[in-house]
Amino acid sequence: MGLFSIFKGKKQVNTEAERRRFLMEKGRITDATIIDSQSTPEGEIVYYVYSIHGVDFESSELLTEEQMKNPLKYAPGAKVAVRFDPKNHGNSILV
């Protein structure tokens, strides 16, 4: 068995649903601030910033249909909660 075959067998599929499920189960919660939003054909994208151990992280997320029911919660300047990966602080989702 060659080296290529070993790595080929460890193929990982990392879908958005799996990422969200992982963060909902294992992610730590912190506060974030919405800094901007943008309407696109796919939906509303919000941009947010949060700080972990003094380091600022900026991210964006396409709002779900459920989140779109409360647009003021995601208006620029609003405080929201995010879950982040304790091993990769840049990986986060809005809660």
Where are these regions (language model features)?
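Oxidizing extracytosolic/periplasmic lumen-facing domains
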Residues: 2-95
